[in-house]
Amino acid sequence: GTIVDQESYSEGDVDFKTQLTSILGKGPETVFCPNYYEEVGQILSQAESVGLNVPFLGGDGWDGLEGYATADQLKDSYFCANYAKGSSPEFEDAYKAEYGEDYPNGFAPLGYDAAKTVVYGVQAAEDAGLEAGTDEYKQAVNDAIASGTIEGITGTFTFDEHHDPVKKTAILTYVDGKPELKEMF
């Protein structure tokens, strides 16, 4: 594909019509919009009002967008996320039992996985019989996480040399305004 336009805005902006009109004038086939759901909802609404009716693509910040955009605005759009609803019914049921509501977005499963990762590292240091708070203990925690494989709610993952997780991502689309897993990639 070819990038036909690149636009930006400042933090706190709520009017995106100038940027969207510029994009529209370039005749795009799709728009990549890696923003958070509150802004994306405003952007999709304003895109519709200026006649920019193409699929939008986004990242994990879109998780929860269905509360901020209509089914028509979300039609044919895709986003990637760390978790797809239904991937772990046990986690979802436990979350609902604890908090009385469905999990709000992918941050809950990610938070669980972050805590599980720390516990994984601490357990390795404890199993080695090291004294908490020592440099050796801290190094054992770091080494275990860096070399381990974690079975998390968002999937199985390891960490690369930059300490970034290596794992699959969920590719989702919207069906009747609700996110639906298309594939794991």
Residue spans for each PLM region:
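Extracytosolic ligand-binding ectodomains
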Residues: G1-F185
